[in-house]
């Protein structure tokens, strides 16, 4: 009886053990599945974080590379711009010098033209003054000659009358003058009132 009880208890314990073992196996299997799922989730999250970190690193490296390329490009542009700027500055200075040279030449040419025109104007003025003086002198001479001619023509009858009277007087004086006619001498008298260069020769009447 006791043996049967022990056997039954042993069977019951065995059944409980088997039941517990099966439950434990089931529990362990569920725990394992949960652990595997958690591991997979962790790996997936870790992989995602790693990928994100790699992407961030790649983006940072890409940004750094892009910034480096931009800096190199700006440096290259600056290095290219400096010769261009220097060349433009040199060209601007040369253009300014050329412009100033052209202005100076233009001013010199204008000055020469002005001096030439002024000289010509002065020469023309002097020639005009000389011509004016010559014309005035000729006009005065003509007026003087004309007035002299008018006076001479106006006084010509009187002069002729006076000459005739003077000739008569000279004839009378000559006729009354005592002179020796043996040597055919000629009595001469210079009349300064009539003409200074005129010499009247009156024959001596004896």
Curated annotation (Swiss-Prot):
Propeptide feature: residues: 25-164
UniProt tissue specificity: Expressed by the venom gland.
Domain of life: Eukaryota
Subcellular location: Secreted
Residues annotated as signal peptide: 1-24
Location (main, coarse): secreted
PTM characteristics: Contains 3 disulfide bonds.
GO molecular function: toxin activity
Keywords: Disulfide bond, Repeat, Secreted, Signal, Toxin
Ranges for the RLWRNWE repeats: 37-43, 71-77, 104-110, 137-143, 164-170
An example Gene Ontology CC term for this record: extracellular region
Family recorded in the similarity comment: Belongs to the scoloptoxin-08 family.
Descriptive protein name: U-scoloptoxin(08)-Cw1a
Organism expressing this protein natively: Cormocephalus westwoodi (Westwood's green centipede)
Phylogenetic placement of the source organism: Eukaryota, Metazoa, Ecdysozoa, Arthropoda, Myriapoda
């Amino acid at each position: 009886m006791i043996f049967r009880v022990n056997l039954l208890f042993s069977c019951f314990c065995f059944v409980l053990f088997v039941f517990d073992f099966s439950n434990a196996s089931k529990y362990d299997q569920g725990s394992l599945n949960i652990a595997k799922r958690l591991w997979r989730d962790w790996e997936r999250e870790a992989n995602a974080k790693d990928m994100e970190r790699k992407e961030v690193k790649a983006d940072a490296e890409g940004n750094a590379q892009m910034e480096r390329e931009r800096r190199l490009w700006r440096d290259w542009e600056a290095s290219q711009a400096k010769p261009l700027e220097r060349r433009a500055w040199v060209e601007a200075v040369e253009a300014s010098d050329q412009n100033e040279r052209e202005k100076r030449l233009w001013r010199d040419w204008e000055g020469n033209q002005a001096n030439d025109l002024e000289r010509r104007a002065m020469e023309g003025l002097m020639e005009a003054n000389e011509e004016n003086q010559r014309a005035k002198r000729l006009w005065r001479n003509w007026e003087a000659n004309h007035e002299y001619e008018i006076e001479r023509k106006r006084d010509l009858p009187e002069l002729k009358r006076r000459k005739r009277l003077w000739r008569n007087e000279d004839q009378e004086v000559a006729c009354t003058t005592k002179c020796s006619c043996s040597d055919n001498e000629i009595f001469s008298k210079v009349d300064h009132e009539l003409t200074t260069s005129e010499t009247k020769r009156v024959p001596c009447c004896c």
